[in-house]
A protein has these predicted regions:
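Short solvent-exposed coil/turn linkers within tandem alpha-helical repeat scaffolds
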Residues: 35-38, 42, 76-96, 106-111, ...
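TPR-adjacent "capping" and linker segments in tetratricopeptide-repeat scaffold/adaptor proteins
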Residues: 34-49, 103-126, 143-144, 192-200, ...
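Repeat-blade elements of multi-bladed beta-propeller folds
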Residues: 203-206, 266-269, 312-335, 361-412, ...
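Aromatic (tryptophan-biased) beta-strands that constitute blades/sheets of beta-rich domains
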Residues: 57, 120-123, 237-319, 340-373, ...
């Protein structure tokens, strides 16, 4: 893995950068990892490696025709496989070929265009005739270095802009900025730069400034505008529907921040971490009064854990409720519950004697205990989209012991909330995905986009394999199934293993942290891998540690405005990537196990484990931290961002901490005042709910809970 080359310029143009705010910060010194032994096996084709060697030989001999011919052949025949662009970073072969072509001399590029321009022209004309986005996508994926590649990038960028996909617009327009004399003399195939566009570069740069502005990066936009005025003070063009001097048009727009409608604040928690980007902030802090109601959650076998986690609690806080309108829903391995979050009554009922169980029917048979030992932490997630609830049900075991007698299958179920009051629409069993006597398991709950859902698949034999699959959200029918990576099994064959991987969905791209040495980006349309990065994986085999919820978290990637944050559970590194390219922005070793990426604001990334930390999102520098030194005061459950504050649960209290400055505003006692415990926090309306291991508790708005004076909390380390 490497630090993003050339600073992160999503493009650097002289002293002018079009990144997010990366260039403005002073990053901490970082050590670039040397080559390491990768823990995963990837679909890298040896034939491609050999043919790429031939391409380089022909280039060195200036045999342009032969080099271009082989490169086109490689892209056509092996385009969907992976190529090691740099140590620890892999690109799809078709993309790497285009990146490489962009660095060819003009005479070689001319030969390439003679061969591919007729096809690219046909696609471009189809797009102009009203065939939509796909012909343009065909150009960018198969003929980006054609004479029509820049036009396709420009039009796709405009479409993304109009749809509010600002990070996607940035990544498309950024590729139109050519390299300059100030760049490294060694051509870098890590990022694509169209070398000879005839589009007006100042106009494209001005659009990139607007992207920064409308993403809420006001200081970055001001900086970029200042650099733009120095370089292109007399440039004219069209911007935001107006013709004129581009600097003046920019100044007029940037002078009015009220034009910007930020999407940081979200209304309802629809999935784990609130949103499918895994980045959620409630608009307003909850009004925490007395306990309004509580619901005891019956235990199932998968919660009665065999290992003993910290403090004698056998059951981890593994329930993650979701909210839809006036109802809150949560599930365990066997049942899905629905409650009215205002009253605590069963969903769609005024009768307290009604059953809160939406799924399954009363005739459902209770699961049996596995025959072989179980290692891991059971967790339960669901997703609400389009008025439907999608949940991962069944055995939490994802890697079944070789001699396990029981069929430990898992299910995906879809319930109709808006029209059917929780009626089952369809169900998929992992038993249906059997392949050569080896059964797949569903990992965590899916993410949903339009009429498609995406979920991680796992199987433990003959090797550990992680896939991402796409299903119809309407019928449950599989659309595609993409292998991500293989790895050797680290847990002995006679043990069942529990995992719960979750995808992240950001601007129509999927992201997955595999927790076994790889992080990947996939295309939602066809499942093709966009990029994959590897890192040194710590081979964890201690059963007690793997089964201790205080030692391992549920940490999918967090996507925020073009940056992807990752804290793999098999690594001590916290990392930030450019989400479009997979290039590393920064990484830093972490002093303790990160169990939650809680959210990212305009300037701060919030993470938690035993303690709570705020980091500069641009550099990874720790700006503040808070928490107890006593292990009994460590973080317990998942917190939530609301307004300007973080509500962070401990076992016996909730700390309310300012997100940007890290000062303690309030300490809410749970155990002492109400005999309650911490857990996973949920905000429904203006109420706070706590999903502790055995109970869901709702706090009303009447009778404020007493808050301890933060000045007396000497055990807290606040910085």
């Amino acid at each position: 893995m490497q630090i993003l080359r050339g600073c992160i310029a999503l493009f650097v143009w002289g002293a002018f950068t079009f990144s997010t705010e990366i260039i403005l910060a002073q990053p901490e010194p970082q050590v670039i990892s040397s080559r390491f032994r990768e823990s995963v096996s990837l679909d890298v084709n040896n034939t491609v490696l050999k043919k790429m060697g031939s391409v380089r030989d022909y280039l060195s001999e200036q045999q342009w025709e032969d080099a271009v011919k082989i490169l086109i052949q490689i892209s056509d025949e092996y385009g969907d496989s992976l190529y090691p662009e740099a140590p620890g970073r892999y690109l799809r072969v078709s993309e790497y070929c285009q990146n490489l072509l962009a660095g060819f001399p003009p005479e070689a590029i001319a030969i390439y265009r003679e061969k591919v321009d007729p096809r690219a022209k046909r696609w471009y004309e189809e797009a102009l005739a009203g065939s939509g986005r796909q012909p343009l996508v065909n150009i960018t994926e198969q003929a980006l270095m054609s004479s029509y590649g820049d036009d396709a990038l420009n039009l796709l960028g405009e479409m993304a802009w109009e749809e509010g996909q600002l990070a996607e617009a940035r990544s498309l327009w950024r590729k139109l900025i050519p390299r300059t004399a100030s760049d490294s003399p060694v051509y870098d195939t890590g990022l694509f730069h169209y070398p000879d566009t005839d589009l007006p570069v100042p106009e494209i740069l001005a659009r990139l400034i607007l992207v920064s502005f409308f993403q809420g990066n006001f200081s970055q936009a001001d900086f970029e505008q200042g650099q733009f005025r120095k370089k292109y003070s007399q440039a004219t063009g069209r911007l935001a529907g107006k013709e004129g001097n581009l600097s003046d048009l920019l100044a007029e727009i940037l002078a009015d921040p009220s034009r910007v409608s930020l999407t940081d604040n979200r209304s309802e928690l629809k999935t784990f971490a609130g949103h499918q980007t895994r980045n959620f902030k409630a608009a307003q802090p909850p009004e925490i009064g007395a306990v309004d109601w509580s619901f005891p959650v019956p235990l199932v076998w998968s919660q009665e854990f065999t290992a003993k986690p910290a403090f004698g609690f056998r059951v981890p806080p593994g329930l993650f409720p979701v909210v839809h309108q006036e109802h809150v829903f949560f599930n365990d391995a066997e049942r899905i519950y629905g409650l009215n979050w205002k009253t605590g009554l069963p969903a769609w009922s005024q009768d307290p004697q009604s059953s809160p169980i939406l799924y399954p029917s009363a005739s459902h048979r209770v699961s049996r205990l596995p025959f072989r030992p179980v290692v891991g932490v059971p967790r339960y997630t669901s997703t609400i989209a389009g008025g439907r609830l999608y949940a991962r049900m069944g055995s939490p075991v994802t890697s079944v012991a070789k001699d396990e007698r029981l069929g430990l299958f898992s299910d995906l179920v879809c319930l109709d909330l808006d029209q059917g009051q929780g009626k089952l629409l369809w169900k998929i069993s992992s038993a249906q995905l059997r392949e050569q006597n080896f059964v797949w398991s569903f990992e965590g709950a899916p993410v949903v986009s339009g009429n498609r859902l995406y979920v991680v698949l796992h199987r433990g034999f003959p090797e550990v394999q992680t896939n991402v699959a796409c299903f119809s959200a309407d019928t449950g029918e599989m659309i595609w199934n993409q292998k991500v990576c293989l790895a050797l099994r680290s847990i002995e064959e006679g043990v069942n293993y529990i995992s719960h991987l979750l995808l992240t969905l950001g601007e129509d791209q999927l992201y997955l942290s595999t927790d076994m040495g790889a992080i990947a980006s996939l295309n939602t349309v066809n499942g093709k891998l966009n990029w994959l990065v590897t890192y040194p994986s710590q081979d964890k085999t201690d059963k007690e540690e793997l089964s201790n919820h205080m030692k391992t978290g549920l940490v999918p990637c967090l996507y925020d405005r073009g940056i992807l944050f990752a804290a793999p559970q098999d690594s001590s590194q916290l990392m930030a990537f450019d989400a479009e390219s997979g290039l590393l922005l920064w990484q830093r070793p972490w002093p303790e196990q990160i169990r939650n990426l809680l959210g990212a604001t305009q300037s701060t990334l919030v993470v938690s484990g035993d303690r709570l930390f705020g980091l500069n999102r641009a550099t990874g520098r720790i700006t503040w931290k808070t928490g107890y030194h006593d292990p009994e005061g460590f973080g317990y459950g998942r917190g939530i961002l609301a307004g300007d504050f973080i509500y962070w649960p401990l076992r016996e209290e909730i700390l309310v901490v300012h997100t940007e400055q890290g000062y303690l505003k309030q300490k809410i006692s749970l155990r002492k005042q109400y005999g309650a415990t911490g857990g996973n926090l949920v905000i429904a309306g203006n109420q706070l709910l706590i999903a502790s291991p055995r109970r869901l508790t709702a706090f009303g708005t009447d009778g404020q809970i007493p808050a301890n004076d933060s000045k007396k909390i000497s055990a807290l380390s606040i910085k």
